[in-house]
Amino acid sequence: MAYKQSITKSDTIRETAGYPTYPSGGVHGGIDTVHTDYKAYAPVAGTVVTAHIWEGSNTGVDSWGNYIVVSMGGDKYWLAAHFATQRWNVGDTIAKGDFIGTQGQSGNVTGTHTHWEYWVGGFGTRYRQDPSTILGIPNGVGTYAVEWDGGDTPTPPDPPGPPAPGGKLPIWLYFKLSRR
C-alpha cells in the first residue's frame, strides 16, 4: 500500500522519529522524515507567518534551524524545520505540493531531515497535535511506500555542483592566486 501525500516526490519516505516521543522515549514534538531526494514539499496550503533564518545556535527557536510556520486558517498551523537554506518570507502564500526547501542540518539535529509539527487551537508548541493527520503518512518509525498527491508543481533544479576538474577558474580567483 502506498500512502498518498504531498511532502515528497520520492516513492519511499523514511520516518526517523514519531510524535510524541523519540524511539528512545524522550519527548518529541513532531515527526522527522528523510526523503530520497532531500526535497520537501508543502503538506497543506497556507500563508507563511514565520520564516526563521538560522543564526547558528542549537537552542531556543534557533534549535529548529531554518524553518517556516504556515497558517492554514482557523487557528491551525504547520511547521517545517531544519532546511539547508531559508527561501520564504512572512506573507508568502504556499500551495499544497509547493517546493518548500531542501532538507538540511540547520539547528539542533543528528542528521539531514525535515521536522514537521502541527498546531491546532493556537500558535505555538503547546498546541501540538499528531502531524501525521496532515502529512498523509503513518505516525511511526519506518520506511513507507508513498505516492505523490500534490498536483503538478514544478520541482526546482538541483543546485550547481563544483566545477569539473580541469575547468576554468573564475577570473577573480586567478588574480587572487597570482598575487601570492
Predicted regions and their residues:
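A residue-level detector for short acidic-glycine micro-motifs
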Residues: 17, 35, 50, 82-85, ...
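Short, charged beta-turn/beta-strand-edge "cap" motif at the junction between a beta-strand
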Residues: 54-56, 100-108
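Acidic, glycine-rich catalytic/binding loops that coordinate metals and/or anionic ligands
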Residues: 1-9, 14, 34, 39-40, ...
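Active-site scaffold segments
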Residues: 30-32, 96, 101-102, 113-119
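Conserved beta-strand positions that form and line the central face of beta-propeller blades
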Residues: 32, 69, 79, 102, ...
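A structural signal for short beta-strand/turn segments enriched in small hydrophobics and glycine
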Residues: 46-48, 91-103
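Zn2+-dependent peptidoglycan hydrolase active-site motif and core
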Residues: 28, 42-87, 112-118
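Short glycine/threonine/proline-enriched tight-turn/helix- or strand-capping micro-motif at secondary-structure
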Residues: 11-44, 53
